[in-house]
C-alpha cells in the first residue's frame, strides 16, 4: 500500500507542477506596448505639404485682383535641415516689372516652422499651407526702388 501512496503522491505532484507551469507561463507581460507613430514637427509637416507643384488660383496687389498672373506656378524645394531651400516660379507675366514681384528662381531661409520664408532678394513671405491650398503673402516695399503698381501687399492663392 505504501507504493500505491507514493505513486499517488508523485502523480499529484506532477499534476500540480504542470498546473503551476501553465499558470505562470500565461502571467505577466501584459499586452505588448503599441509603438506610437512619431509626431512630425511643424516644419516637417509643412515641408511635406509644400512638396507639390502649386498653380495660381488668384493674385491680388493691395486688394486689387491681378489677372495678368493667370498661369503662374510655384514649386518649393526644402533643404533636408528644413532651414531653407529653393523656389522655382513659372508663368510670370511678360511685363519686365512683374519680374520684380517674383523671379523665376531663388533661394530662401525659413522660420523654424516653415511658415515664414525670407527670399534671397530680402522679401519676407508668410505661408499658410494645407493639403488643398497655399496662400503666400508678402509686401514689396517702395524703398527697394520697385516700379509703382508693384509695391505693396501681395497675396498669391495657390492650389495643387
Language model region names:
Residues 2-14:
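Bacterial N-terminal signal peptides that target proteins for export
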Residues 15-16, 51:
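Small-residue packing motifs within transmembrane alpha-helices
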Residues 23-26:
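C-terminal motif of bacterial Sec signal peptides marking the signal peptidase cleavage site
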Residues 28-103, 111-160:
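Lipid interaction determinants
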Amino acid at each position: 500500500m505504501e507504493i500505491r501512496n507514493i505513486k499517488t503522491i508523485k502523480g499529484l505532484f506532477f499534476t500540480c507542477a504542470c498546473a503551476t507551469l501553465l499558470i505562470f507561463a500565461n502571467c505577466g507581460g501584459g499586452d505588448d506596448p503599441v509603438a506610437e507613430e512619431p509626431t512630425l514637427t511643424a516644419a516637417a509637416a509643412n515641408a511635406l505639404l509644400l512638396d507639390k507643384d502649386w498653380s495660381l488660383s488668384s493674385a491680388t496687389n493691395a486688394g486689387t485682383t491681378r489677372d495678368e498672373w493667370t498661369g503662374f506656378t510655384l514649386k518649393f524645394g526644402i533643404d533636408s535641415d528644413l532651414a531653407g531651400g529653393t523656389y522655382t516660379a513659372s508663368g510670370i507675366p511678360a511685363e519686365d516689372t512683374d519680374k520684380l514681384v517674383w523671379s523665376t528662381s531663388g533661394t530662401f531661409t525659413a522660420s523654424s516652422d516653415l511658415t515664414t520664408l525670407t527670399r534671397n532678394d530680402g522679401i519676407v513671405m508668410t505661408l499658410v499651407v494645407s493639403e488643398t491650398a497655399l496662400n503666400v503673402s508678402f509686401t514689396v516695399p517702395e524703398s527697394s526702388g520697385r516700379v509703382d503698381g508693384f509695391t505693396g501687399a501681395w497675396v498669391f492663392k495657390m492650389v495643387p
